[in-house]
């Protein structure tokens, strides 16, 4: 289990062994017994090179006691002496989501909320899909700059949003073709759960490229 020094959530850390007999009964009890650090709903892991990324669906990066946060992605550097830091969070390197106000007509803001599933992109970027309504797909470039020196990479961008509000994008991954991203859609408001392939379309004749989306399986 991961244990961050000094009872903090970020910084120097260590891996501590668990009582495997207790793990078979309750992994949470086993982790608590060795003082492992608690995070809010770690939903998915993705390793890129020597960094392990973790989607924390309800993490609050500013208030460790809050279990209803907007979510975040953290990175664990897998060195002999591991370190932990947050790399994606609303209000840091992504907008805070604001729902549109029907009464006033005020427009909403598409923000980052409920990080849920992760994928390693072909160029080393981290792809993130939300458990949110509406569910969005974001792309984080871990190697991008940090202009305000807050520890969060500046290269965090919105890639796509589902129009089906109840639906949840999940199971995001790249196949053998580095230009094709697969996204599973569940809990669709239309009852049409599906797997979608988002592919770069090469137009030729110097007309550039565009993204196309195809449902490769559904019901």
Q: Where are these predicted regions, by residue range?
A:
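Sequence/structural signature of beta-propeller domains
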Residues: 1-219
């Amino acid at each position: 289990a991961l244990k961050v020094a000094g009872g903090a959530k970020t910084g120097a850390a260590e891996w501590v062994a668990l009582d495997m007999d207790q793990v078979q009964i309750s992994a949470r009890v086993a982790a608590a017994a060795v003082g492992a650090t608690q995070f809010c709903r770690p939903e998915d892991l993705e390793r890129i090179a020597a960094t392990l990324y973790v989607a924390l669906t309800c993490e609050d990066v500013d208030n460790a006691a809050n279990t209803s946060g907007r979510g975040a992605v953290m990175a664990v550097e897998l060195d002999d002496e591991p370190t932990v830091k947050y790399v994606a969070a609303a209000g840091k390197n992504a907008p805070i989501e604001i729902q549109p106000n029907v009464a006033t007509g005020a427009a909403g803001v598409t923000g980052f909320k409920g990080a849920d599933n992760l994928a390693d992109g072909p160029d080393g970027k981290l792809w993130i899909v939300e458990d949110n309504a509406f569910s969005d797909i974001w792309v984080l470039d871990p190697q991008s700059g940090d202009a305000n020196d807050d520890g969060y990479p500046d290269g965090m961008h919105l890639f796509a949003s589902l129009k089906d509000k109840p639906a949840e994008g999940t199971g995001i991954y790249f196949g053998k073709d580095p230009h094709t991203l697969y996204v599973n859609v569940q809990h669709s408001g239309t009852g049409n759960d599906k797997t979608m392939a988002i592919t770069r379309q090469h137009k030729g004749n110097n007309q550039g490229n565009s993204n196309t989306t195809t449902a490769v399986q559904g019901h």
